[in-house]
Amino acid sequence: MATRISLRNARFQQLQTLLTNRNKRHRAGQFIVQGVRPITMAVEHGWEIQALLYDGERRLSQWARDVLAAHPHTEHVKMSPDLLAELAEKDEVELLAVVAMRPDVLDRIEAGPDFLGVVFDRPTQPGNIGAVIRSADAFGAHGVITTGHSADAYDPKAVRATTGSFFAMPVVRSPSPAAVISWVEERRAAGLPIVVVATDEHGDADMSAFDLTQPVLLLVGSENDGLTRAWRDAADVTLSIPMTGSASSLNAANAATVVLYEARRQRLAK
């Protein structure tokens, strides 16, 4: 039997905090997902759906009815249209999902001979995190790691920007570079020669001339400050992206996309 929310009561306020308060979101271990494709991807990839919030005053689409029917033991919450729209930050919405977070454990990322991973160091914009995740998924990466004091990958803007890719690959936060560098060294010691690759306008080599078919961990610097000294020191090579025109650099997410595409191109041609 579905519960109901028709007032801005304590439960509604708790749901709001999952959207607006990073600390409370992580304490609860939950985040809100909206949209047909993101919710479908979360279900298909086995994410734990903890509650389904839906418009209790309209006839739901077949898709929404199917999602509800597929989760009979998940909490179903009927909401008034105005409150549901407030959570979704849009007027027309029929279904939202409350999803359990997955642990920030680097071992969730599988690293084999064709490994391609991304580190996004201290990103400040949730939308850029989402864009990097989307590109990483599109071009065959095995995971994305955010490091340092950064925007939250579970921020609704970040999740929305991935258009569902967030649920298809591991996305892990590491407080500092040290844990990631240790993770790389462990895999090197086990025989996997991961190459740590940074990019810069004054790089050591053009990216198209470098072998990106080997196991690669791509470093993407903060939008404002680039990579920290720790990451610059950890990089085995710094590549440049060939550009014309007056632009001296690319947006962090765009730069990551270009290198990920080049890695995919080389691997397909191999």
Where are these regions (language model features)?
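Short, acidic/turn-prone active-site loops that include or flank metal/cofactor-
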Residues: 57-59, 81-83, 149-151, 176, ...
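Arg/Lys-rich RNA-binding interfaces used to dock onto structured RNA substrates
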Residues: 1-126, 149, 193
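RNA substrate-binding interface of SAM-dependent RNA methyltransferases
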Residues: 101-203
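Short, hinge-like loop/turn segments at secondary-structure boundaries
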Residues: 69-70, 95, 161-165, 190, ...
